[in-house]
Amino acid sequence: MATDTAAPAAMKVDGSALAGRALAAAGARHMFGVVGIPVTSLASRAAAAGVRFLAFRNEQSAGYAAAAYGFLTGSPGLLLTVSGPGCVHGLAGLSHATANAWPLLMVSGSCSQPDAGRGDFQELDQIAATKPFIKIAVKATTIADIPRLVFQALAATVSGRPGGCYLDIPSDVLHQTLTESEAAALIDAAAADSAKSDSSPPKHKSLDEGIEKAAELLRRAERPLVVFGKGAAYSRAEDAIWKLVDTTGIPFLPTPMGKGVVPDTHPLSATAARSLAIGQCDVALVVGARLNWLLHFGEPPKWSKDVKFILVDVCEEEIELRKPHVGIVGDAKRVVELINREIKDQPFCLAPSHPWVEAITKKARDNVLKMEAQLAKDVVPFNFLTPLRIIRDAILAEGNPAPVVVSEGANTMDVGRAVLVQNEPRTRLDAGTWGTMGVGLGFCVAAAVAEPDRLVVAVEGDSGFGFSAMEVETLVRYQLPVVVIVFNNNGVYGGDRRSPDEITGPYKDDPAPTSFVPAAGYHKMMEAFGGKGYLVETPDELKSALSESFRARKPAVINVIIDPYAGAESGRMQHKN
């Protein structure tokens, strides 16, 4: 009998296998993408090395999944694409991650180096294509480059302000080989070099002074406010911020994806008194949230012209751009811990009877009562409020761990933000800084694999759902515990709302630009792949569908028929349209 006498050290390892092993050695656990030339083998080899590969139907959705994974875990999300158009499709997720300051590494195959510039298959200068959206772009020109660049690029995604990075591996490099011993040595060397590098941001020279000034400003303020965003959620600052709120009695306001860092049900929540809180506060501690359009740029008339901002951000450029009264460069969790320590030396606490606290809590209570009065009505055909109330109650009934809620759409997301309750951090994913539509089902997959003990509930407008609807097959293929609820109001913002005098011109018989096929059977898409579909038009039907699907924890689509005239065009962004 013939035997293979070759020593293990002499066995060959190609570039795909080396990349997979390097990713695993660097701590990667999940990768999202679409396979094809030249990266199919890379996906398989990475899986063999311990990196679970989640195969999508579209690189955009895979990219959004990788971005959300970075936010949820604090570790880089991995996106794998083919060359050329696959790389271009991946730019959606890559840019979304960078815009939201989430760590993501996109790995793409590219054309063979000897054929570059000659019109090779799917040829594109992918380094140039990705550069506007990333922190760094690196290219492996030989197989020996791969481990070092994997570790380098992954580290760059999380250093300083998190964001997207890009690794380009040409097809000829993926096919190059070296021995097992050479591969192991390269990975060991890359790991050792990475361990020597301190990726944590250096202590800023003005940190101590900034902490002292922040504590003193809060102590002297008559109407202080704590504002926190998804940056605080990303840094796991919830314990520190909750302690700050409880020990000082300062009201707080979360941005949409900051919801849950401190429970929405906390008595000092100013969410339902937002206009009063930002309009009258005299000192605002802003943690992990940028003073961009979401916070009205920190300017009048929404904010008082005399407000003093204490801005905490990991990015020094953000501080320099906004020019706050006090700017502190640093990790949100660490900075708030230091503020707590400083306050402990000279403690203060606003009592519930403090005029500012009383004004906030009274306004919030009054607005909540008004909202609850509207929510208590069972309106059929459905408006947005009735089904959202039923969904809210079903989600809250799940208890702990709370489901991750994915919210996408115009009216669906806007109204849902006011109705749905988050009591745990990182349990709300939405369109984010860019207001990106198309993130929904990619986010669902990311949440399901990043938080396997949680149910995932997507509350989607029918337009938002349409961007990634084919990924229902992905949900079924991996049997993920995701329930997708589609608010079906026949179009973008609603059905055909045109008045007769608007229906003119040579194409007047065409559907309105905002309208879809009425009462489309979105639930049947899920059924086509073996999942569970529900069509609901009444409160009892919705309650039954939610109860059954939540209990099953299997892929499901609940198609909720909404009055096409409910809601408003452009949601709450009419002034931008």
From Swiss-Prot:
Taxonomy, superkingdom: Eukaryota
Listed GO CC annotations: peroxisome
Enzymatic reactions: an (R)-2-hydroxy-long-chain-fatty acyl-CoA = a long-chain fatty aldehyde + formyl-CoA; a 2-hydroxy-3-methyl fatty acyl-CoA = a 2-methyl-branched fatty aldehyde + formyl-CoA
GO biological process: fatty acid alpha-oxidation
Sites where the protein binds thiamine diphosphate: E59
Coiled-coil region: none
Residues that hold Mg(2+) according to the record: D462, N489
Residues spanning the membrane: none
Record flagged with keyword Signal: no
Keywords (A to Z) from UniProt: Lyase, Magnesium, Metal-binding, Thiamine pyrophosphate
A molecular function (GO) term: magnesium ion binding
Function: Catalyzes a carbon-carbon cleavage reaction; cleaves a 2-hydroxy-3-methylacyl-CoA into formyl-CoA and a 2-methyl-branched fatty aldehyde.
Protein family membership: Belongs to the TPP enzyme family.
The protein, known as: 2-hydroxyacyl-CoA lyase
